[in-house]
Amino acid sequence: MKRFFKPIEKENSPAAKKPCLSPEKRDGDGDGVEEEKNQNEPSKFMTWNANSFLLRVKNDWSQFSKFVSDFDPDVIAIQEVRMPAAGGKGKPKNHEELSDDTKVLREEKQILTRALSSPPFGNYGVWWSLADSKYAGTALLVKKCFKPRKVYFNLDKLASKHEPDGRVILAEFETFRLLNTYSPNNGWKDEENAFQRRRKWDKRIVEFLNKTSDKPLIWCGDLNVSHEEIDVSHPEFFATAKLNGYVPPNKEDCGQPGFTPSERGRFGATIKEGRLVDAYRYLHKEQEMESGFSWSGNPIGKYRGKRMRIDYFLVSEQLKDRIVSCKMHGRGIELEGFHGSDHCPVTLELSKPSSEMEQNQVSN
């Protein structure tokens, strides 16, 4: 789950040394939104499932703005924007624009626009990929001094096409690509919008990774899967979870969505085939019960205290040695640092590449 005030810039930061320009879009050659070549590249990233971006702006914007100001990310990836795409009833949708077709939607668009024009967000260019209704959707905020060369909104890298429900934003920089996804939930049953949808998604992700191996990748977002037992607070609870007593016929599909053996196995195979590194687990080998999970259940009810790590930064092996830090910024079962969402922000910081390393990454 989105520009014109003077930005707040940290002393000695790249943005402070070089003025940030507006992200002027220009039509490319039919394969995405292409931007001017920029020799500086982002190195600080943040991903967050906002669980309704509008609600976060209305209720939690001050604390989230402070978090962004303090960390000063170059790129912010948002999932579960939950704002509808522009286009009236029965008309083609513009999935890159917020809808203003009704009085309520116009007011909501104005709220988001004002929020994203205020410090520190006025320093970022914003790209949206929105669903037809207030469901799912993603956003990508990139500092204006780090303009991507191209931006796509699908796994097939086709101009103007958006994934159903706005689940993908792919930004191409000079030496790497950044993929922001809101991966579909597995659901509880072998139905078209549950198990089948997730299997198809996982298959397409592998195909995407195989087609784009010419350049290192940073894949972030809500990937809706916990890879290992260490990635959940209560493995037995999640492994035996049921919906209204229903048990899938295949034991590989049993358990909490995001923690079934089938999903976990496919996720592990995807990481291996894509030659990816889980940045957080690369640095944090042991389970951290206070701050090692990105999603937390409702503090009231059976999911109280039940937590999962389902938000990730996966990076190509070529980038492994540049990982400086990868942190989850929520703590405890009371959702401290979650900024109103049921997910907390996750951040990644890379060291600056040497000239030789940059050349090798592009050539490999």
Curated annotation (Swiss-Prot):
- UniProt binding sites for Mg(2+) 2: 222, 224
GO MF, one term, reads: nuclease activity
Query: Which residues does UniProt mark as catalytic?
Result: 182, 222
Q: Which cofactor does it need?
A: Mg(2+)
Which ranges of the sequence are coiled-coil? none
Could you say which residues are annotated as the site Important for catalytic activity?
Answer: 311
Note the InterPro entries from the entry.
AP_endonuc_1, Endo/exonu/phosph_ase_sf, Endo/exonuclease/phosphatase
Question: Residues at site: Interaction with DNA substrate?
Answer: 343
- Which segments show compositional bias classed as Basic and acidic residues? 1-12, 23-39
- Which residues does Mg(2+) 1 bind? 80, 342
Following inactivation of the gene, the phenotype reported is: No visible phenotype. Ape1l ape2 double mutants are embryo lethal. Ape1l arp double mutants have no visible phenotype. Zdp ape1l double mutants are embryo lethal and cause DNA hypermethylation and down-regulation of imprinted genes in the endosperm.
Which residues does the annotation list for site: Transition state stabilizer? 224
Cofactor binding, per record: Probably binds two magnesium ions per subunit.
The highest taxon in the source lineage is Eukaryota
Its GO biological process annotations read:
DNA repair
Sorted UniProt keywords: DNA damage, DNA repair, Hydrolase, Magnesium, Metal-binding, Nucleus
Q: What is its EC number?
A: 3.1.-.-
Q: Where in the cell is it found?
A: Nucleus; Nucleus, Nucleolus
Tissue expression remark? Expressed in leaves, flower buds and developing siliques. Not detected in roots.
Q: Name one GO cellular component term.
A: nucleolus
Q: Where is this region: Disordered?
A: 1-42
Role according to the record: Apurinic/apyrimidinic (AP) endonuclease involved in active DNA demethylation and gene imprinting. According to a report, also displays an in vitro 3'-phosphatase activity. According to another report, has no in vitro 3'-phosphatase activity. Catalyzes the conversion of the 3'-blocking groups 3'-phosphor-alpha,beta-unsaturated aldehyde (3'-PUA) generated by ROS1 to 3'-OH. Has a strong non-specific affinity to DNA. Redundant with APE2 and at least one functional allele is required for seed viability.
Oligomeric form and interacting partners: Interacts with ROS1. ROS1 is required for APE1L to stably associate with the DNA substrate.
Similarity comment: Belongs to the DNA repair enzymes AP/exoA family.
This protein's name: DNA-(apurinic or apyrimidinic site) endonuclease
Lineage at the top is: Eukaryota, Viridiplantae, Streptophyta, Embryophyta, Tracheophyta
Gene behind this chain?
APE1L
